[in-house]
Amino acid sequence: MMEPYVTSLIRMLSQMGYTDVSYSSKERELNLRHVYLKTTAHFVQPSTRLGTDVKRMQAFIQTIVRMMVYSYPKLPLDVMSDLSIYYTYTVILDDCKQRTADTMQTFTVDLIHGSEQRHPWWQAVNQHLPSLLKHYGPFCSMTIFRSTLDFFQGCWIEEHEFQGFKNSHNYPEFLRRMDGLGHCVGASLFPKQDFDESKHIPEISTVIAEMEQWEMHVNDLLSFYKESSDSSDQANFVTNYAHCTGCSVEHSLSRLTDSVITSGNAMTTTLADKDGRIKEVVEGFMQGFVTRHLTDPRYRIQELVQQTQNSRLSGQEELTTFWKAAMEVGDVDHKLWAFPPLQEMMHGNE
């Protein structure tokens, strides 16, 4: 599967014209530092960590801070920081092994009546959401909240480790849309201090519609090597789709790549003659989101590049060129920005 996978990566990177020029090295480092300190300070209190081990929490924060700074280069730093805290909560939930159903018996009624939720994750997130949503107008705020509900329900389904029944062709996409946070990503690009929702609903809703597919499927594509190599992480979108539809994994991978290219082209061509600021924000996200994946060690792209070179696979030179371009702008050692560690900040807060 390595050669078809490399072909898919090159197709995607070539079609989007990957060239990330959003930051100078110093700007990237300074933004990482700022967002790291704000995010870590939030999770000093035990109630915010929801029982997550401190070492694991440190890894979550560093992962999300990189994602935020790389993917949202046009976002004001205060918005970036509050969004970083929000996304860290989503990682905590995704990692949680606690069964959800017991604390969800009254969720809907409590939501309608404005009563406190019983699930500890919702208690913590509801404390933070007003701080995040104050940065957005009513349309984007509703979209972010609705996407949060979908994400929670998607994680609820995933607790059952259910890959989908064979012949249920729509199930893999249904689940992926629920837990992909694509609508949240699309809406979060447009804080009210930079964009007047009332003037840009058509453009914003179009970005949300296309970003849902693009963001989650880029993540699926760039995660595929890591997930395929990890025996504990075999169930991924590519294999789930192949399982449910009966197609080959190679066909599923090709279909995924087509989806990324189609939705990416739809965004760039649709916005080409629209407000230049919207186009700039969306393109900045797309370039940075890819840089984040290509440079983050957890996705093991460097290992993939080395394997393609050693095997002299077709496309290895092109993939190496893209990877080196990403590393040139995005390879920032966490020791330059991820300090002091959460453990130390917790002791200082005692």
Feature roles, as predicted:
Residues 1-350:
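Alpha-helical, largely C-terminal catalytic domains
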